[in-house]
Amino acid sequence: MARRAAAVLLLLALGCLLGILLLCLGSGDARGPPSFKYGIVLDAGSSHTAVFIYKWPADKENDTGVVSEHSMCDVEGPGISSYSSKPPAAGKSLEHCLSQAMRDVPKEKHADTPLYLGATAGMRLLTIADPPSQTCLSAVMATLKSYPFDFGGAKILSGEEEGVFGWITANYLLENFIKRGWLGEWIQSKKKTLGAMDFGGASTQITFETSDAIEDPKNEVMLKLYGQPYKVYTHSFLCYGRDQVLKRLLSKVLQAENYQETVANPCWPTGYRKSLSLSSIYDSPCTEKERPGLPLNTTVVVSGTGNGNLCAVHVNKLFDFTSCSFSHCSFDGVFQPEVSGNFIAFSAFFYTVDFIRTVMERPVHSPSDLKDAAETICATSWNELYQKAPRLEKRLPDYCATSTFVYLLITKGYNFNNRSFPSIAFQKKAGETSIGWALGYMLNLTNMIPAQEPASHRSMLYNYWVILILLFVITTLTALLTAVYLLRRSKSSTI
């Protein structure tokens, strides 16, 4: 009996050895590390331009979960819309970052690397102020075409496109559409999508999936990604970005002070003073309707008084919370269904809350936390603020106004309450990739997200191959040792 068992174990050991041999022979055909493909997107925002370089394994182009941020470069100077009076400078401002892209993307990949530019709210405002003006964009396109990449065009994104592409980016990076299974196959993710809130320099966007009826067709976007339908609500509020809000707020303060030579600003910290020309406030379509009859070269001295309650009164005037012809509205008569699920808030949302958490050392877990933090910032003198964060000197005077605005926008505007506010994650990145519309824009233009679900397939990943080899080795050794033991036992019993 022992001999028969030993024979079976020997056969098992031989089978395992054969399996190891086959795996090793099969591995001889395996390719080495995959080569990468690259894509470049220029995010031409209202306040600045950023260049993002993405990469993905060349053999995974039609899959997901594989695109990552390879590098990024912040362009020095303002956004391209600021160069309307000197368009050639807009193109020249990009040269440093494009030279970095030449180094970051392997030379042999340059010709196959798509290059796109998307301009957002700053250019949307410029087309309002000067509809025929395309000179800035033309100058930028001429610069981009002079580089050896595969230039795919430049476009001024609509506010809704900006919102939807940001939503796609966030959910793509967090694998809320599709994810890789244990055996290397792509499977539908069971996680719910999360909403996206973007707070840029000239506009703010809110985008989220909803099962509620969307009463205004302009706010409804139907998407089909990986075979799954998504009904998405989105809206972009032009003139509600950080920089434009600050201009509009100064206009309200000047109005309240009757445009005196010296103006008290409750949204600036006590001890901070600055001389401003009216042209720096009323040079935007967002403020031109409130332009006074004074010459635009008139200078006023604005002095901070650090009054949080009065600042909130002025910030509240930026919104219209009363007009609404729908069952639910956010503000300015815009329909919005009730917010639901988790949200991710990025751009200036993140920077504002990060300032509260890191510089002011205050938690932000509820609406009252955000309100209290805003009031604390407003009550802090300029000297105290500067001692806390000297490197933020340029933005420092405006954190009182910005944090007050973010509080009112989220609570009174988007209607987050004590129950729903904790569902907001204030983040800059997902993993190592920046959250924003740029990645979603590239994925759309390169057809990296198919409408249909990818065919189910399995791939023998390296880790699984190693585990399988180890299992075969352990099984073989166990079988051989057991067989030897049984044979020795059989011989000793026959003596």
Swiss-Prot record:
The active site is at E162. Keywords: ATP-binding, Calcium, Disulfide bond, Glycoprotein, Hydrolase, Magnesium, Membrane, Nucleotide-binding, Transmembrane, Transmembrane helix. GO terms for biological process: nucleoside diphosphate catabolic process. It is a multi-pass membrane protein. Its main location: membrane. CDD domains: ASKHA_NBD_NTPDase2. Residues 26-465 are extracellular. ATP binds at G201, A202, S203, T204, Q205. It comes from the Eukaryota. It is found in: Membrane. The chain crosses the membrane at residues 5-25, 466-486. Its EC number is 3.6.1.-. GO terms for molecular function: ATP binding; GDP phosphatase activity; ribonucleoside triphosphate phosphatase activity; UDP phosphatase activity. Glycans are attached at N62, N297, N418, N444. PROSITE patterns: GDA1_CD39_NTPASE (PS01238). Its cofactor is Ca(2+); Mg(2+). In the nervous system, could hydrolyze ATP and other nucleotides to regulate purinergic neurotransmission. Hydrolyzes ADP only to a marginal extent. This is Ectonucleoside triphosphate diphosphohydrolase 2. It comes from Gallus gallus. The gene is ENTPD2.
